[in-house]
Every structure is written in C-alpha cells, then in structure tokens.
Amino acid sequence: MSESNSQIDEQGAQTYSSHPPRIVVQPNGAYVVSGKVRLTRRFRVFNDDREPIAWRAGEDFLIVDEPYKLCRCGLSKTKPFCDDSHETASESEWNGTITASHAPRSTRQKIYPGTGLVMTDDEILCGGYAFCDRFGTVWAEIEHVSDPAVRAHLTEQVSLCPSGRLEYMLALNGAPVEIKYEPMIAVLHNGPYWVLGGIPIEAPDGQVYPVRNRQLLCRCGKSKNKPFCDGTHWDIHFRAE
C-alpha cells in the first residue's frame, strides 16, 4: 500500500495569483498557462488489491516565467514544459488538431437516477483512472444508493474521478456536488494534466470550452478527443518520467 491512503486536503492551499487563470491551446502547439496557476504533481494511492483509493500530493514545480507553456505533443525533452519540439515533429509523430466538441455535457451524458441521488456519465471524457471500479462499480452501486454505506462509497468514487466523466447531484437538474479546489494543474505520472478548480480552456479558434471543475488535458499527443485526454496514453505506453 502507498504511504498514504487519505484524500488530498485542499484547505489552506496556497493561492498563487488574484488574476484569472486561463489555458490557451496554441494551434498545433503548446498549452499556454496564464494567471500564475500552480503546477504540481499528483499520484494515485492503491490498496493491497491494487485498486486506486485516493490521490497523493507531490512536489510543486518552480515557475520562473509567466505565462508558461506546457508540452502538448508528448515529444518535449523538458517535460512537462514545452521546448518547441512540436515545430520539428513529423506528421506521423504529432497532429495537434482539436477534435473535442464544444457542446455542453448535457447533450452527451447518460443519467443514472438513484434514491436521493443522481449520477451522470459523460463517457468520452474518461481517462482510465479506475476509481469507479471498486465495490462492483458505481453503475451497479447506484441501484443500491439508499444504503448509507453504498452511498458513501459512490460519492467518494465519483469525486475522485479526475476527468469529470462522472458527476453526481442530489436531485435531477440539480447542481453537481463538487470539491472546491484552488485553480491548479497537476501533472499525473506518465499521464495527462489534471486541471482543477474551473480553469477556462480556450481552443485555438478562440472558443472557450464549458468550464468544469475537473478536467484532464492530453499530454501524450495522441488523444482522439484533443485537447482532452481519452486514455490513449495507456494504450501507447506513454513515458514522460
């Protein structure tokens, strides 16, 4: 088991700037991060059965320049920062075309009603981090959510989902129940950027995606739902560290 099995305590986390944070996706290029957004690391914590049960905080990166650029092509030699490797990459190595829809989540999500709780699932956002699979999966649990123990498991699992694929609310058409995060970006081990705290993501054409509390941005360069992660980094065995 990892040295820690508790969730990250976001209380008292340092706020880096009062300026509005923002991430701009450059055409066939990097992510440009402004607003002095904290850049850190996060690691999954596993139990003895190798099931992910929590997130562990890692060290912060020292940010010297503002704004800063994060690698999007997966080829930089200075990961997670961009070194302009995308400019010399071949077409087979890198295609930064944005493919993710700007349509609201409500147009794609599946709704799973339960007793006193509603779960929604926007599957295209899945990054494959598997918090949803414990206790027989959240899709099975929702049918028994009137049981307080099952309800506690499900709400924790949904909240741990880094991509925001899963959300829950207390009533249909209610507001999603979310942990309040400071705006920050967490680099996941050999995986995507975990964007927390409702940071706007601006596409190369200037359109801003619907703002979400939990988002995963592709770092391997091969997602079919760019700029968002679709779990392809697992399939290609992406190695950044």
For each predicted feature, which ranges?
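A cross-kingdom feature marking solvent-exposed beta-strand/loop segments within repeated
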Residues: 47-67, 202-215
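Cysteine-centered iron-sulfur cluster-binding motifs in ferredoxin-type domains/subunits
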Residues: 24, 70-80, 118-136, 148-164, ...
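Extracellular/lumenal glycan-associated surfaces
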Residues: 30, 34-36, 80-86, 134-137, ...
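Non-heme iron-sulfur electron-transfer modules
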Residues: 18, 25-26, 40-42, 46-54, ...
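Iron-sulfur (Fe-S) cluster-binding modules
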Residues: 1-27
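Extracellular/periplasmic metallocenter environments
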Residues: 66, 73, 79, 86-93, ...
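Short, solvent-exposed interaction modules
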Residues: 107-127, 134, 182-211
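A short, structured beta-strand/loop element
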Residues: 31-60, 124, 133, 138
